[in-house]
């Protein structure tokens, strides 16, 4: 089995998880982030189109987990957890 990716959560994403999202959504997003996302980030999400091509997006109901993958350092940086209507603005 391959080694898991290291997790980095941006200050914005941390604030969204702890203060802005409904508790049930924040819990589900966090479980996803520390589980399947760190196991295989390329498989659980899709690469975004320009100008956001350095990011990936994974669906969690009507919310999106937006993240960057650094394959060299095996690091996933979560940059946001937002409702899909606001995710790509």
List the predicted regions and their residue ranges:
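Glycine-rich phosphate-binding loop
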Residues: 62
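Short hydrophobic/aromatic beta-strand micro-patches
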Residues: 68
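Residues forming the ATP-binding cleft of Hanks-type serine/threonine protein kinase domains
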Residues: 82
